[in-house]
Every structure is written in structure tokens, then in C-alpha cells.
Design a protein with these regions (language model features):
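Intrinsically disordered, low-complexity regulatory segments enriched in Ser/Pro/Gln/Gly
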Residues: 122-128
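Cysteine protease-like catalytic core of ubiquitin/ubiquitin-like
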Residues: 1-122
Length: 128
């Protein structure tokens, strides 16, 4: 997506991984939301929703956008796990699990993602 934002407007529920513009990845989703509302799954949340994320979601939804709501989720322990967390949050949404209800097994997240990519299928990430 990024600064060009060359994509189709979404008209149904969606899950999207977005780059914040500051070396960070997050997951957003409208699954189970009131129309126009989008949930933000951010493993490095600091009480501020990045303007770039808001602008990308507005571009995705056009006139139907109302607002973003932060979902309290597990926070990453290092400065380099945001991408794997964004994929894990997305995967849990696909499988209809709520990321705030469990704790991912961080040391096993990257090996799991590598295995999923080799197999060509995303499965639930390991939890503790």
C-alpha cells in the first residue's frame, strides 16, 4: 500500500497488514466491527495511532471510514518482531480467534512462520 495507495476500495470485511511509515508493521481488520470502524492490532502500541495508518485505512474504506479502535494485544519484547506479530494477528483473525485472549510463544513464532511459508499454508501460531 504505502504512499501510492493504489488499490481497490474494500466493500466487505477485511484484514490488512500495514506499514506505519516508521519501520513498523501492524494489522488492521474490520471483521466483526460496526460498519466504518476498524480494529488496530499493534504489538508496539504507545497510546498513539500513527497518522500513516489512519490515512491508509481511510484510503481503503473511502467514505465509509469512521474510526480506528486499538485492541489490547500482546506486546513484542524486541524491536524486530512487529512483522511476525502482524502476521500472527492476521492469522488468528482468519481462524476466528481473538488475539487478546492468548499469549504467543515468541521464540517459536519465526520458525512457525518459516514452516508456514514453506508449506504454503498459514496455521495458528504457537501459544503458551
Amino acid at each position: 500500500m504505502g504512499p501510492i495507495r493504489n488499490f481497490d476500495i474494500v466493500t466487505s470485511e477485511f484484514i490488512q497488514i500495514l506499514h506505519t511509515g516508521h519501520m513498523h508493521w501492524v494489522c488492521v481488520s474490520s471483521i466483526g466491527c460496526t460498519p466504518g470502524i476498524v480494529k488496530l492490532y499493534d504489538s508496539l502500541y504507545h497510546d498513539i495511532i500513527e497518522e500513516e495508518v489512519t490515512e491508509q485505512v481511510k484510503s481503503l474504506m473511502a467514505d465509509s471510514y469512521i474510526g480506528l479502535v486499538n485492541v489490547p494485544v500482546q506486546q513484542q519484547l524486541s524491536g524486530s518482531d512487529c512483522g511476525v506479530f502482524a502476521v500472527a494477528f492476521s492469522t488468528s483473525l482468519v481462524y476466528a480467534f481473538h488475539s487478546q485472549d492468548f499469549t504467543f510463544d515468541i521464540p517459536n513464532m519465526r520458525p512457525h512462520l518459516c514452516q508456514c511459508l514453506r508449506m504454503g499454508e498459514l496455521t495458528m501460531f504457537p501459544t503458551i
